[in-house]
Amino acid sequence: MMKVALKGHGHDHSIELDVGSTVKDALDAVGIHPSTVIVSHQDVVLPHTTILNGDVSLELTIVSSGG
């Protein structure tokens, strides 16, 4: 198991997931729809398919759209 922190813009979650889980798995585990956020780690944007292999803290940026 690994610890994943998801923080930013009103979110502050800390969860445990199996090693090899994806960014999308982490978002799903806390009920955040992947299309509503951009996820980054150390100022690098991560695709939702990124595999997580150890404890990590992820920064969330809310995506807004409209006209």
Model-derived segments and spans:
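Ubiquitin-like/PB1-type beta-grasp interaction modules and other compact soluble beta-rich domains
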Residues: 1-66
